């Protein structure tokens, strides 16, 4: 069972991937509206 190892992988993954997606979508939104 990998249930014990899952949080140790899932938490850093969300902690790194989610902000990266948020920053990427934010930068695309700013470029699309040309708000500098």
UniProtKB/Swiss-Prot annotation:
InterPro entries documented for this protein: PSI_PsaI (IPR001302), PSI_PsaI_sf (IPR036357)
Swiss-Prot/TrEMBL GO biological process terms: photosynthesis
Keyword Plastid: yes
Pfam family, one: PSI_8
Transmembrane regions listed in the UniProt entry: 6-26
PANTHER family, per the entry: PHOTOSYSTEM I REACTION CENTER SUBUNIT VIII, PTHR35775
Family: Belongs to the PsaI family.
Name of the protein this chain belongs to: Photosystem I reaction center subunit VIII
Protein species of origin: Drimys granadensis
